[in-house]
Amino acid sequence: MTQYYYLVASLPLLLFGDPPPFGSRAWLDACREQVAESDHALLARISFAALTPRPGDHELWRAYASWETALRDELAVQRAQKLGLGPDPFLREAPFYVGLAAVAKEALNAGTPKAVEMALDRRRWSRLEELETGTQFGLGRLIAYRLKLLLLERNYRFRPEAGIGAFTEEYARVMENAAAWTRAAAPPSAME
């Protein structure tokens, strides 16, 4: 099993709730020179959007993807129950994990949609910490780091100041366009 002592030792500590120290794309680019090609291909393939580990993929990725799928299934069951729907069309095959129903229920009762997402991401983070125990300097540690970095990037997009800044820029652009359209539509005599 390949060990990545220098790379793992050089990675900044990731803490839940902190901004990401760099983007996951930049991190993958930096890893390209230091990890085996097959390991880099796996790291690049890992995402929350596609929980599709392949046979032969690292055990940590397979274990996490399995747990995440079970969590999503439990969320689908509880949301469907609230809406009076059957959950079957939303479920994917996943093993049973003790306590996952309580995790989903607690998160769904967190309040606002942002609070729900933060509660779920905090639990995802905890699961990754459980799985990475004992991985030391191997690929498992890099997989957990990749997933944590993706979580930090996702949470960073929820920042109110980023939303306010984007809104302010878009509003200014709309107002500029409206003023230009008003001037363009005004009859020539109104401009004199």
Give the location of each predicted region:
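Extended alpha-helical surfaces
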Residues: 1-192
